[in-house]
């Protein structure tokens, strides 16, 4: 999965390394962080676009995010698509949850 900053800049390191750098930078600047993860999808005529985001919120000071986009040509109903959204969010959360525990950063996974 290719991760990008909201600006479109591609992340060349692993998302785990990028999130750790962000946590260190933001906590050194005095911010308490919270991470929110979610996935949404949009059905097109020939495929479905999925976007998973990792949002780092600075308590009372805005935030920033990383986004990974994927396309699927599989035909699926809304229930299957929603379950796939939840799966992508949970997989992303599992990939960084140990890091968040180390730095005592709260995690929220959106499953809607």
Model region roles, listed by residue range:
Residues 36-39, 108-112:
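Short glycine-rich or small-residue beta-strand-to-loop segments that form or flank ligand, phosphate
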Residues 1-36:
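Basic, amphipathic N-terminal segments that precede the first structured/catalytic domain
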Residues 37-38, 44-68:
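Acidic, metal-ligating active-site segments
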């Amino acid at each position: 999965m290719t991760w990008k900053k909201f600006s479109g800049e591609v992340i060349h390191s692993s998302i785990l390394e990028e999130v750790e750098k962000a946590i260190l930078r933001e906590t050194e600047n005095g911010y308490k962080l919270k991470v929110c993860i979610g996935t949404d999808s949009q059905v097109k005529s020939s495929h479905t676009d999925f976007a998973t985001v990792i949002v780092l919120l600075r308590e009372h000071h805005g935030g920033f995010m990383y986004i990974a986009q994927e396309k699927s040509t599989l035909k699926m109903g809304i229930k299957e698509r929603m379950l796939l959204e939840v799966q992508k969010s949970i997989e992303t959360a599992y990939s960084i949850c140990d890091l968040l525990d180390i730095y005592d950063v709260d995690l929220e996974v959106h499953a809607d």
